[in-house]
Amino acid sequence: MNIHKSYFYYNAKKDDSEIETAIRSKANDCFDGFWKIFHRLRNDGHVWNHKRVYRVYKELKLNKRVPLRKRLPARVKNPLITPSHENITWSMDFVTDVLQCNRKFRVLNIIDDFDRVIVGQKVAPSMPAERVIRFLEEIIWEKGKPNNIRCDNGPEFISHKFQDWCKGNDIKIMYTQPGCPTQNSYIERFNGSYRIAVLDAYIFRTLDEVREITEKWIEYYNNERPHDALNNKAPMQYRLAKTG
């Protein structure tokens, strides 16, 4: 009777409970895929092999998520020159959505091109040039003034009030060419991530609900969410590593 000797040995199953707990803690507060979660675990100091983490990830059925809405085809993005430090160039753009009652609202997103930190975000029913200027003044008072602002040719940004304000504050406006969103691809990419994680993921009844969820997600985005272009560091982690 030939019986392989491995029959007499018990192969203990690895205890993956710690990995399960860690994955759940990252997956429950966002809509990230596997690699974002994996790099967040690495940034927290965990050194588990990615194959083992992915096996647990699949066992938890986190790879079975259904998209909330059909996504548009990916746009071709031209590379931009990344500034050498913060507050050289900010990029800004609007995102528009509706509340449950079909009331429209706008979100002004402002990003630092150096490290993709969101320096400001404003949720409002409308954002004329005057409100954009007031919001920029609030941010500059707290975070300092950029040398340049990159934006499209929206009516708020081409208004005489906005142009005069920028000129008076020695800020150069870097307008993108009409129909060329790739020239502002840093903020375009952020807008896409924000829409998937927040605007498409929730049904909002009030603007206060939009602000509450947005503020929570921006805190996560700036301080925890790994970014492909930042060596899989979160924007503030990258800034601290570069500037000390």
List the model feature ranges, each with a label.
Residues 167-171, 193-244:
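C-terminal domain-tail junction helix/linker
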Residues 66-69, 150-153, 168-186, 203-207:
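RNase H-like polynucleotidyl transferase catalytic core
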Residues 1, 8, 23, 37, ...:
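Mobile genetic element proteins and their domesticated derivatives, centered on retroelements
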Residues 121-122:
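Short hydrophobic alpha-helix segments
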